[in-house]
């Protein structure tokens, strides 16, 4: 099987693509890949490091207001389609999959027009502009949230989940807890604000640290590397309780996620895929700084099923943070109910499901 993959702009589009590629390599060692991204996007540094052949095109997104830039974007799109067709003809893929971001537009559109089987993968509950546009032309639209399905032609929608979920399975949670200094018998909560951290969550944590010191559970707090020194400076003035462990970054996140009892985090699509695959209850603090407020809508999909609580950033204080953690961790029945609800939402074999959809299209 020859697979052309395109996705870029943010890690939320790139890492699911790479997780899918790794799964296909396991199931089909003979498979060959080409990844098309943008020259300056995050994918241009991440993908080549994995050894996957990479090509780039020039593309940008539409501005929401009428502007001359949109004329340039149309011109870039048309040029991107021509460049994509050239790469496609040269690589001769059996199937093309787009995982989101502007770069998918010309690549997947070009493939569809050339009669090659095509799929787009939508990670969020609210689809991006590119995937909505492409849904008219592709063979299948793979989704991770039921709420996303209503935005696409129903005959094309398949629920596969996020391939990243498959990569957190079969991890050693006890090893994960030991690696960060958590004790095995005690309940624990992991609090983090994404790979770069989140200042409002850091501020609430610092305010809460003295009260956390009186709790029977342990707290693992991940600041994000850019915030670590500032947080530790503030913590020194208040004191660091024995049951609170602070780290700038965690390199073995799947192991640690497996080991803890509760997670407090943003509501990015990849994070939710991992948490539900593991059956982890969560307190979700959606980032209000994302397109279409999609994190709040992602969170709502999990909260409505009883697998999480949602704490909006505008309501985030030391008191509300501790309240929500206590209500879950200190009540065994609530904790168990939320674990079951999260597990029912999870799709741990998402990468395999997506590969099956691809296989069916190729064999048609």
From Swiss-Prot:
Name of this chain's protein? UDP-N-acetylglucosamine--N-acetylmuramyl-(pentapeptide) pyrophosphoryl-undecaprenol N-acetylglucosamine transferase 1
Task: Please tell me whether the keyword Cell wall biogenesis/degradation is annotated for this protein.
Answer: yes
PANTHER family assigned? GLYCOSYLTRANSFERASE, UDP-N-ACETYLGLUCOSAMINE--N-ACETYLMURAMYL-(PENTAPEPTIDE) PYROPHOSPHORYL-UNDECAPRENOL N-ACETYLGLUCOSAMINE TRANSFERASE 1
- This protein's superkingdom? Bacteria
Q: GO molecular function, one example?
A: UDP-N-acetyl-D-glucosamine:N-acetylmuramoyl-L-alanyl-D-glutamyl-meso-2,6-diaminopimelyl-D-alanyl-D-alanine-diphosphoundecaprenol 4-beta-N-acetylglucosaminlytransferase activity
| Pfam families noted in UniProt | Glyco_tran_28_C, Glyco_transf_28
Q: Which Gene3D superfamilies match?
A: Glycogen Phosphorylase B (3.40.50.2000)
The subcellular location is:
Cell membrane
Q: What does this protein do?
A: Cell wall formation. Catalyzes the transfer of a GlcNAc subunit on undecaprenyl-pyrophosphoryl-MurNAc-pentapeptide (lipid intermediate I) to form undecaprenyl-pyrophosphoryl-MurNAc-(pentapeptide)GlcNAc (lipid intermediate II).
Q: Which principal EC class is assigned to this enzyme?
A: transferase
The record's section on HAMAP family has: MurG (MF_00033)
Topology in the membrane? Peripheral membrane protein
Name its species.
Answer: Bacillus thuringiensis subsp. konkukian (strain 97-27)
Q: Which residues bind UDP-N-acetyl-alpha-D-glucosamine?
A: 10-12, 124, 195, 250, 295
Q: Which UniProt keywords apply?
A: Cell cycle, Cell division, Cell membrane, Cell shape, Cell wall biogenesis/degradation, Glycosyltransferase, Membrane, Peptidoglycan synthesis, Transferase
